Amino acid sequence: MTTLTRQDLNFGQVVADVLCEFLEVAVHLILYVREVYPVGIFQKRKKYNVPVQMSCHPELNQYIQDTLHCVKPLLEKNDVEKVVVVILDKEHRPVEKFVFEITQPPLLSISSDSLLSHVEQLLRAFILKISVCDAVLDHNPPGCTFTVLVHTREAATRNMEKIQVIKDFPWILADEQDVHMHDPRLIPLKTMTSDILKMQLYVEERAHKGS
């Protein structure tokens, strides 16, 4: 067993790669399960040894990839507190938030050969939870859209303009009015703890969604 800092072996990059791959699958699956887009644009794939639904719509896929490409430098520096998938109604008011709380320890005690296989087993459990989450959530109104929010640590927020990694895809400071839900219902879905990562997933659901 070896103790490493986050700087060793570009370890921040390894964790960021794992997280971005997982979040891409998770976002696609959330959009499918919560019926934000027609089921016809999704195709069944296999990720983490389980079947998942992934979009085959080029523009949607590009948006998700661009978003995570911008998140990746923040994950590498351990500057991300939460990644939030917000589902919005026709009036652009949030009806649901899928919140991924992420914690990365500064010191890592790991053996390299067991690292990824163990973490992927834990991430598989998240995917399975997302795939059945509609059983504990109310139906959403028709015509919903989505956006992705990133909650960063304070120091990172001051440097956001310096880490724009895709031209014409800038970070925009979220307006609290646009993302606030009054007294939402909180539904915990999954928690994981590993040597390289702690993550909690829960949903905040608006009490009255309309139709």
Swiss-Prot record:
Keywords: Cell cycle, Cell division, Chromosome, Cytoplasm, Cytoskeleton, Disease variant, DNA damage, DNA repair, Fanconi anemia, Mitosis, Nucleus, Transcription, Transcription regulation
TM annotation in the entry: none
Chain residue ranges for the region called Mediates interaction with REV1 and REV3L and homodimerization: 21-155
One term of GO molecular function: JUN kinase binding
Keyword Nuclease appears in the UniProt entry: no
GO cellular component: chromatin; chromosome; cytoplasm; nucleoplasm; nucleus; site of double-strand break; spindle; zeta DNA polymerase complex
PANTHER family found in the cross-reference section: MITOTIC SPINDLE ASSEMBLY CHECKPOINT PROTEIN MAD2 (PTHR11842), MITOTIC SPINDLE ASSEMBLY CHECKPOINT PROTEIN MAD2B (PTHR11842:SF15)
Protein name: Mitotic spindle assembly checkpoint protein MAD2B
